[in-house]
């Protein structure tokens, strides 16, 4: 089998998936990049078959989704695998990012790998948002109205851009068609950029829990880590199957099973759970433009982490203070997610503003200050 992949045109598989030198001490948290690619493949395959039966028209979209579930052979499986696959995809992505934060994968020489990864995250979020509009339920319509209307906060040209996005003066048929087209296109762009992400990774080599560069004991990816990835894939499929077969509607919003009605506003408009922390940041800023800027910075600030961090030690195993701060950040994000799902009323507004403030303080003050403090307290030359 190995000899087969040494042939011309297939040697890229041999070099990057079979003989690729991998640090011997990586553990299962390094499996989530592979699982993310599996999730992306599942979303693309199920999405293609769903698009065959879906009708992007405001009068037919809701019923076409019902038709897929009720009348198409295994349509229920396609729909639930795609809908729950999005949630599982974000779980995998967030764990992948958390591992990078905990073990310092964003520090040079892998900083460009990290930046490309943040760009992929932005594309995934945009794709998921447009996909959530397609079932044309109540939350689909009103969520699209609320989020796209945020662009109107841009001075001078905001309202014109919103009208252009909508294709009219409200979220309507033109909007649905545009979102469907881009939702179909974006996953293929994500695949292309994911290969760029892998190219940067393989240029410098995979990281490891110790955060060391050289010397590191390495072994070939096949068969050792391929088997490890396969075991992780089995566990992932079991977890995924739990939602698809037994809890298919657990992660959905009940109001989105009601056909979109532009006259009736839902009592509580909330995005999918994976957007809730960022939605809480948006709502915590009273000024509309300020909220838009805050939510953009809250994501882009991850891309600037390699330059905000002023210490070359990567792994939190050698940074006890940073390790504690990481779990503080983890708690901050969980609280933001909880606040994002609550109504805009006291005391949730004040709590959201406080936690949003702590989120930005963590990245803009704690991280740079901690680097200087650790340099002062510890001689890190011995780590290498």
From Swiss-Prot:
The chain crosses the membrane at residues 32-52, 76-98, 113-133, 179-199, 225-245, 289-309, 321-341, 348-368. Heme b b566 binds at residues 96, 197. GO terms for cellular component: mitochondrial inner membrane; respiratory chain complex III. It comes from the Eukaryota. GO terms for biological process: mitochondrial electron transport, ubiquinol to cytochrome c. It is a multi-pass membrane protein. Heme b b562 binds at residues 82, 183. Binds 2 heme b groups non-covalently. PROSITE patterns: CYTB_CTER, CYTB_NTER. GO terms for molecular function: metal ion binding; ubiquinol-cytochrome-c reductase activity. A ubiquinone binds at residue 202. It is found in: Mitochondrion inner membrane. CDD domains: cytochrome_b_C, Cytochrome_b_N. Component of the ubiquinol-cytochrome c reductase complex (complex III or cytochrome b-c1 complex) that is part of the mitochondrial respiratory chain. The b-c1 complex mediates electron transfer from ubiquinol to cytochrome c. Contributes to the generation of a proton gradient across the mitochondrial membrane that is then used for ATP synthesis. PANTHER family: CYTOCHROME B. Belongs to the cytochrome b family. Heme 1 (or BL or b562) is low-potential and absorbs at about 562 nm, and heme 2 (or BH or b566) is high-potential and absorbs at about 566 nm. This is Cytochrome b.
């Amino acid at each position: 089998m190995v000899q087969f992949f040494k042939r011309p045109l297939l040697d890229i598989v041999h070099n990057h998936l079979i003989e690729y030198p991998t640090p011997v001490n990586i553990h299962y948290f390094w499996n989530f990049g592979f699982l993310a690619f599996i999730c992306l493949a599942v979303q693309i395959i199920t999405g293609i078959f769903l698009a065959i039966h879906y009708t992007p028209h405001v009068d037919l979209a809701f019923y076409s989704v019902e038709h897929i579930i009720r009348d198409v052979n295994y349509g229920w499986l396609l729909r639930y695998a795609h809908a729950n696959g999005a949630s599982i995809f974000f779980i995998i992505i967030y764990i992948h990012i958390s591992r990078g934060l905990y073990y310092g994968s964003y520090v040079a020489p892998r900083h460009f790998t990290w930046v490309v990864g943040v760009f992929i995250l932005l594309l995934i979020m945009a794709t998921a948002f447009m996909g959530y509009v397609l079932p044309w339920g109540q939350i689909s319509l009103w969520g699209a109205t609320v989020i796209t209307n945020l662009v109107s906060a841009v001075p001078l040209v905001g309202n014109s851009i919103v009208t252009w996005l909508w294709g009219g003066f409200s979220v309507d048929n033109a909007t649905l068609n545009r979102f469907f087209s881009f939702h179909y296109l974006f996953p293929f762009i994500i695949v292309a950029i994911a290969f760029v992400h892998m190219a940067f990774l393989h240029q410098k080599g995979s990281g490891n829990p110790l955060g060391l560069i050289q010397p590191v004991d390495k072994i070939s990816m096949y068969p050792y880590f391929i088997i490890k990835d396969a075991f992780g894939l089995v566990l992932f499929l079991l977890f995924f199957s739990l939602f698809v077969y037994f809890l298919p509607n657990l992660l959905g919003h009940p109001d989105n099973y009601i056909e979109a009605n532009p006259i009736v506003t839902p009592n509580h408009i909330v995005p999918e759970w994976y957007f809730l922390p960022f939605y809480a940041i948006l709502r915590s800023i009273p000024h509309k433009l300020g909220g838009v800027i805050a939510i953009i910075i809250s994501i882009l600030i991850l891309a600037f982490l390699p330059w905000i961090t002023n210490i070359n030690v990567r792994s939190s195993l050698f940074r006890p203070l940073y390790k504690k701060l990481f779990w503080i950040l983890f708690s901050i994000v969980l609280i933001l997610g909880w606040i994002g799902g609550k109504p805009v009323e006291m005391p949730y507004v004040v709590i959201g503003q406080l936690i949003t403030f702590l989120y930005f303080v963590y990245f803009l003050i704690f991280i740079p200050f901690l680097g200087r403090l650790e340099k002062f307290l510890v001689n890190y030359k011995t780590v290498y």
